[in-house]
UniProtKB/Swiss-Prot annotation:
Keyword list, A-Z: Chloroplast, Membrane, NAD, NADP, Plastid, Plastoquinone, Quinone, Thylakoid, Translocase, Transmembrane, Transmembrane helix, Transport
Top enzyme class: translocase
Recorded coiled-coil stretches: none
Assembly notes: NDH is composed of at least 16 different subunits, 5 of which are encoded in the nucleus.
Topological category with respect to the lipid bilayer: Multi-pass membrane protein
Listed name of the protein: NAD(P)H-quinone oxidoreductase subunit 6, chloroplastic
Main subcellular localisation: plastid
Subcellular localization(s) per the UniProt record: Plastid, Chloroplast thylakoid membrane
Length: 177
């Protein structure tokens, strides 16, 4: 989207805040259905970031693949779970939770120190309009298809095998009831 500077900045900050709150919802909600809906919100915000970056095809692929398929599959698997499997116990903190929070806090402080120590003056933040070559959407889609079937064939197939194994594992876990 071609927006003016302040509007674009406000949208980026707003989407970033919604993205952070949605991510916290994914982690902190005890009900897995609420967590799955928060994950859907996070994935929609990522798609809106792609729209702000003028990458409409990636935004559409994000919506179709992740929100439309993966998140619906997660909700479908959660619906097959019994209610007792995610009961609300009073045992809120375990040793694993403490270790996880310690590791995440350490990573957060490491990122903050890295960002504050980085010299940002040499980075070009925007692209100039004369450097962007306009191409048809069809040719871009064809180029993506050609790259996926030639240059990135092995990673593409490995990702599809990983997704297939995850799907089979989720189905087998749901059937063990």
């Amino acid at each position: 989207m071609d927006l003016t500077g302040p509007i674009h900045d406000i949208l980026v900050v707003f989407l970033g805040l919604v993205l952070i709150l949605g991510g916290l919802g994914v982690v902190l909600f005890t009900n897995p259905i609420y967590s799955a809906f928060s994950l859907g919100l996070v994935l929609i915000c990522v798609s809106l970031f792609y729209i702000l970056l003028n990458s409409y095809f990636v935004a559409a692929a994000q919506l179709l693949i992740y929100v439309g398929a993966i998140n619906v599959l997660i909700l479908f698997a959660v619906m097959f779970m019994k209610g007792s499997e995610y009961s609300n116990d009073l045992n809120l903190w375990t040793v694993g939770d403490g270790v996880t929070s310690l590791v995440c806090t350490s990573i957060l402080f490491l990122l903050i120190s890295t960002i504050s120590d980085t010299s940002w003056y040499g980075i070009i933040w925007t692209t100039k309009a004369n450097h962007i070559i306009e191409q048809d959407l069809i040719s871009n889609v064809q180029q993506i298809g050609i790259h996926l079937s030639t240059d990135f064939f092995l990673p593409f197939e490995l990702i599809s095998i990983i997704l297939l194994v995850a799907l089979i594992g989720a189905i087998s876990m749901a059937r063990q009831n």
